[in-house]
Amino acid sequence: MIVADHGRDFAPDQYVDLSAYRVPCVIYAPGIVPPGRLSTVCSQTDVAPTVLGLLGGEFDHGFFGRNLLAAPSGEGFAFAYVNDMLGWVSGRRAVVLMPDRPPMLFRITDSGQDPASETEIAAELPPLREKMLSIYGVASRLYDEVRYCSPEKAATVVRRPE
């Protein structure tokens, strides 16, 4: 598996361009993984569970991601966080939150993104924003409370000083 660390340069305080977060990932495993292209939204949190899936067997892991080779097509989401911008992509929609700005909703296209219409924003932004913040909040809390793994493993985790 070959995966990049990040996409091209961006300036989130000037313009929110989520295409800067598109990161290539290539799995080369002849005889194990057939050639193809995933159409689902995924993120770097999915890398380790996918590698574990390629190894086979059952794994008790605390990753918030999923095995991309076993995930349903079209499912998935990805977060982008830099400076004070939090972006969330799910399907063909993206929500972006920045301090001192109203929440933004974008339509994701094959060539980039387009701002959503006022009608789309009124209808779609509130439930998408709520889902985004719920997922982010749960992940953050599980991490802070070391509840992302079994109690036995949690006992061995070195905790951050308060």
Predicted regions and their residues:
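Solvent-exposed soluble domains appended to multi-pass membrane proteins
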Residues: 1-162
